[in-house]
Structures are given as structure tokens and as C-alpha cells.
């Protein structure tokens, strides 16, 4: 069996510690280099009532659950991987890519979309909206995004989102198209990877989705025909019993394999193939939609005034080296001129202002007759 198959097998609650130790030995046989320093120190957390959560003791005596190990390695959460597996190298982290491809693990691409959406909402708070007014305002503040989506609407090309909903362009306005797509997101999803995990097929698990958007159109959403883990109807209907969003802060139950086993959100997926998973996706905001579609590069100020200003700035930037050269030449010429005026013109002026020296020749000597002298 593969690494992710064996890792998935220990993502559950055990009746005793010994059973986990046995399964972990099989996991170690398929563990790639760089990860054994943690996985060879198995431990459990006693949940009471004959229930034990499997996990591992880190060098700082911190306990990390098998569910968390599954989550960070399946989703390629590199910062968390480095935090747990101290001293691991880039090639060792990269070795997981091939292992994910072998088992069609889809989590990494979904993690990228989610992380990108979070970054969009943090950097561009105006996109963290779900209302028509908020979406319209955000589009006006990000005209490049608006222009791109208007072009997509004109082309009439629909896009499949991570949660199985579609962004289609059939409403009267772009804002209406976006709002309809946002309304159709949020819930518990059964996800199956293919093409090395690059492609993911997702469908909505209605019985695990405890709060849907009131405007969700289920005819536009892929709904799972059956639950992949539970076939008993009464058991499925009981999942959302007593649900309270204000307390639980999520729209799902039994949809998070890495959740605390004592919480209503935990689900045991150890029987699923490694290329399959159940996950909760919270209702999208505009920022989540942008991150899902990978359009974050179109964000930023460049409105009509901005475009004109940016255009002028672009021309100025191109001419700036020439302007500096001309300025330097003119400055040098001015310096030379001032030096010339001081040394040459200034010296001539001093001579002119001095009183002139007139050399008068002495009078000629004339011999006069004595009579003329009388």
C-alpha cells in the first residue's frame, strides 16, 4: 500500500493505543525520507470511554494528531510541514508531490484556492462581501477584474468552482451572475480526485450541510446521490440535529477529518480511498470566488483616472533617463558659462572701470629770438 493509503488508515479514533501502534508500523514502511523522525514516535490522547486519538509527540513534547498530519501533507501546507517536521529539506517535501499524484489526492489544489482566497480578502477587504451592492462596489474599485469578467460574460463561458457550483453568465448583469454563484456555495462536499489530483469532482452532501444559503438553487449544484460513508437514512437525518451556527461557526457537521474527535465536525474517513475526501467549504464571498478562479492578479487600483495617470507615469518613466541627461548637460553648460563670465568677462570689466592712463609726450623745445622774448 502507498504512503497516503496508510496515512489515511490511521485518521480515526482507536479503541486502544496498541491498535494504533500496529497500524503505524505499516505506515512507517511506506514513509518517505524526512518524515520518519516524527512518525516513528507514535502516541495517543485518551478521549475517555475507551476512545483514543492517534498522533505523534514532537521534540518539544507537543502532541500533533494523525488528522493534522494527514491534512498538512495531503494539502501541501509547506509552512506547517516545516513546523512539524523539523529540518526537512525542499526535495523531501517535494517528494510528496509524486506520492499525491499516484493516489490522485486532490487536497493540494483545493488548498491553493482556499489560501489564495484568504489572501485576497486580507489584501483587498472590499472583496469580502456577498451582497449585490458590495460586489458592485468591489468591481468598480477593481476595473481590470471588472473588464475581464465582463469579457467572460460576453463570451458566455461558464466556470466550475471548487465546491461543485458554477459561475455562469446568463443573468441580466454581471453582478447578478456573481451573486447567484455565491448563493450556490457553502456546505459539506464529497471530493474525488483524478488526473493525478489535478482534477476534482465534488458534490454536495445535503445531510452533512446544516445551513445552506436560503437562495441556493439546488438544480444548479451537483448533489451527491448517496453518502459515501453512511447509508442509514435515520442516521443521516440525525447529523444536523440541534445545530447552532452561532456556537459552531461552520455550516457543516461531520465533514472535517482533522477536527477534534469530540466535536460535531469530526468525520472518520479512514475507509475512503486516499484520492477521496469529505470537506466543509464555507459560503464564498467575492474574495473566495476570485481566489478560486485565480484572478487575484487583476486586483488593484487602475480606474479611468488611474489609467490616465498610470499612462502618463508610464511615458514619464520611459522618458526619465533622457530628461536626466538633458538636465545634466544644461547644468554643466551653466557652470561653464558662470566660470567663463567670472574669469574672462569679470576681469575685463575691472580694467575698464579703472581710470585711464594717458601718456602725454613732453612739449618740443623751441629756440626763440631775443626780440620775440621781449
From Swiss-Prot:
Region (Disordered): 355-374
GO cellular component, one term: virion membrane
Keyword Glycoprotein applies: yes
Glycan-modified residues: 183
Spans traversing the lipid bilayer: 155-175, 319-339
UniProt keywords, alphabetically: Glycoprotein, Late protein, Membrane, Transmembrane, Transmembrane helix, Viral envelope protein, Virion
Family listed: Belongs to the baculoviridae E56 family.
Record's function text: Structural protein that is specific for occlusion-derived virus (ODV) envelopes but not of budded virus (BV).
Intracellular or extracellular location(s): Virion membrane
Protein's recorded name: Occlusion-derived virus envelope protein E56
More info: Expressed late in infection (18 hours post-infection). It remains detectable up to 120 hours p.i.
Keyword Transmembrane tagged: yes
Species, as recorded: Orgyia pseudotsugata multicapsid polyhedrosis virus (OpMNPV)
Membrane topology value: Multi-pass membrane protein
Domain of life, source organism: Viruses
